[in-house]
Amino acid sequence: MAFIAALGLLMAEICPAVICCSDGTLGMHNAVQKGQDTQKQLDSLTLASINTDFAFSFYKELALKNPHKNIAFSPFGIATALNSLTLGAKGNTLEEILEVLKFNLTETSEADIHQGFKHLLQRLSHPGDQVQIRTGNALFVEKHLQILAEFKEKARALYHTEVFTANFQQPHEAMKLINSYMSNQTQGKIKELVSDMDGNTSMVIVNDLFFKAEWMVPFNSDDTFMGKFIVDRSRHVKVPMMKTKNLRTPYFRDEELKCTVVELNYKGNGKAMFILPDQGKMQQVEASLQPGTLKKWRKSLRPRKIKELHLPKFSLSQHYNLEDILPELGIRELFSTQADLSGITGVKNITVSEMIHSTELDMTEKGTEGDAITIVGYNFMSAKLKPVFVKFEDQFLYIVLDQGDLWIHVMGKVINPSEK
């Protein structure tokens, strides 16, 4: 299984005046330590819980705007890009971003939030020799625009952000530079993150997340067959259906929400949770998505023998303009002329004109090589439960999680596995 997520923020100068020239380069800088000695560091599990809250809020808005489409997005990627932007946001612009990301400054300081992300990014940068996880941030700046040294230093130290200069007066040249960078970062998976740009753009921030892992118990490709998948009451499609028999894996039947939850582990640091609502119950399950729901599912999962598991093989490619989505959640000023990003340039002359998020997700029988881990916590009584058959032949949800902190890397919904 592999996924790649990328996000781009296009910013424009509100005023057309030319600002002092900057070379846009960065030197080496030690990690920012401000606040760490006096503030309690944000616990990684708390950070993951906050991210889950944001992830589910964002998902619900996506589902509302895309009721009949597959969904794939990276809450981690979006949160990382937005949070790096808070290094330069001020006033109400900053407050709106933090509120939508579910942070409460009365409980956690900005310094602790940034330190929490920094340590998480450091951990993800060293997942082990076999697991492939890579994150990256890049800032493309108009060659005549001056970026504050403090912002560049913190962006580099906390979010591993690279800074490049670009000639946005030549939009096609700038787009070529950005898309070439993203293509290299995503191994050619995302070749055209930015497809349109005008001469008013002065800054672009992009974020990418690459994750690839192998199932702990891979599906046998010889068992994959063409099976029926129900798109809606009047339509079904034939899709490649992966199959495995006599699998022992975490399972939970949620009678309250009328859905079945199955968890499959990856070799290495990750797991995938698949949620199959009973027919006609998808909206009920979606409405219930909140951190407490995920916590309940995680606590209720028990090893269970699945006599036969069917899961469609699918490949999704989704592209979202977040300037149409985030204002509905509460981030409005960022996309208006009232935006205050003076912590980036020193003056209030930058606004975000476009924010793009792209995700490529492949769910296959095997994946790539990785270190094996051992499933723990078996319940002796579960051996007395009858084996079950689980067939994902109707629309379902999926959540890819970090094994340790339960951070949501990617999540979404499959309505039609035959469509990208």
From Swiss-Prot:
According to UniProt, the name of this protein is Serine protease inhibitor A3B
The family this protein is said to belong to: Belongs to the serpin family.
Which keywords does UniProt give here? Glycoprotein, Protease inhibitor, Secreted, Serine protease inhibitor, Signal
The answer, when asked if Glycoprotein is one of the entry's keywords, is: yes
Which cellular compartments is it found in?
Answer: Secreted
Give the record's glycosylation annotations as residue positions.
104, 349
Q: Which Pfam families match?
A: Serpin
The domain-related comment in the record is:
The reactive center loop (RCL) extends out from the body of the protein and directs binding to the target protease. The protease cleaves the serpin at the reactive site within the RCL, establishing a covalent linkage between the serpin reactive site and the protease. The resulting inactive serpin-protease complex is highly stable. Variability within the reactive center loop (RCL) sequences of Serpina3 paralogs may determine target protease specificity.
Q: Where is the signal peptide?
A: 1-17
**Where is the stretch described as RCL?**
367-392
| Record site: Reactive bond | 381-382
> What's the miscellaneous note?
The single human alpha1-antichymotrypsin gene (SERPINA3) is represented by a cluster of 14 individual murine paralogs.
Q: Does the keyword Secreted apply?
A: yes
> What is a single molecular function from GO for this protein?
serine-type endopeptidase inhibitor activity
| GO cellular-component term (any) | extracellular space
